[in-house]
Amino acid sequence: MALLAAAALVVAACGNDDDGDDTAADEAADEAADEEATDTGDTGRTVTIAASVPPTDHGWLGQIAAKAQEAAEQWDDVQFRLVEADDADDQASQIQTLINEQPDAIVVLPYDGEQLTPVAEQAMEAGIPVVNVDRLFATPDAARATILGDNYDIGVKAAEFIAEQLDCEGNVVEIQGIAGISVTEDRTQGFADKIQELCGNGIDLLAQQPADFLPDRGLEVMEAILQANDNIDAVYTHDDDMSEGIVAAIENAGREDEMILTGAGGSCNAFDRIEEGGLYAATYLYSPTMAGSAVNLARLIAQGEGMTDLVEPEVPSEIIVPPTQVTQDNVDELRPLCFE
């Protein structure tokens, strides 16, 4: 599995942390110790890693925090602190405080990548490497490394699935995440580009509205769309947790047999729905394990180490995790990857 492989790559460390004042004997001993650490995953220099995330107010973000904490706890040489922000302004203030505390690295899943770019750049300028998760900063200078899912490809794969199911004819609704962030824009653009390529004008996009990744907002938005449209063939949603509200609206209206729905994220609730068959036809894995991988990357960078499976001595600047489509055909096989 590509997602598991990406996560596995960042778990083990390799490096050569020699001191220029060491004697030749000491240098040889250091090199031998480094080689042993490469093979066994032994601890290195103790580092302090801070993580800043948005409110963990739905399942995926809750798992982001949990996976980051789990990864940090695997290492005896990591001191870890996670802070949650109420909004983008609060997060910027929190990161400024973290900069003043001088951790060895900061992991950031920004509330809004563009708005948080200046403070991330400040951290980098202060010599604190930043690992960017999920929502991109506005400039590459704001992070030493970035790990994210391929949001554009989620849109592409959803378009391919819906185009096939509808035979490129029908009415589609798109329920987006948070307006203006890179995740939403990429998922929307990937879908738009692919559906146009495959179907031309055969698919009519009836509505396209954000619901902020929240189930309650999904319910409200979908209720209004259902009232305004008598014939809907498919719903492309950006998030499985948000889709719980969307599904509730459709079922409350008694219209679940009229349409199909695709999600994104890989929640266990979505897996259950897909296994049952009917309305919820597919989702796309966008695993919160990337937060754990981000902590592992931050550890390697802070310790000046690289990744054992790569020839290059430094951690790559970008890791993109491809989405995996989940349907009735493979839901049982992929169930270990879902999140509660």
What name fits each language-model region?
Residues Q91, I147-V172, R217-L219, G266-F271, ...:
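Hydrophobic alpha-helical segments within soluble ligand-binding/sensing domains
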Residues A72-E84, V172-E174, E197-F213:
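Short beta-strand elements in bilobed, periplasmic/extracellular small-molecule ligand-binding domains
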Residues G41-D42, V47-W75, F80-S93, T97, ...:
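Extracytoplasmic "Venus flytrap"
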Residues D39, R45-T46, A179-V183, K194-L198, ...:
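Hinge/cleft segment of the Venus flytrap/periplasmic-binding protein
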Residues G59-Q74, I154-A158, S182-G202, R217, ...:
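Short, solvent-exposed amphipathic alpha-helices that sit
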Residues V108-E125, F191, A207, A211-D272:
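Hydrophobic alpha-helical
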Residues C14-E27, E31:
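Bacterial lipoprotein signal-peptidase II cleavage site
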Residues E114-D153, E164, N171, S267-E275, ...:
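Flexible loop/hinge segments that line or gate small-molecule binding clefts
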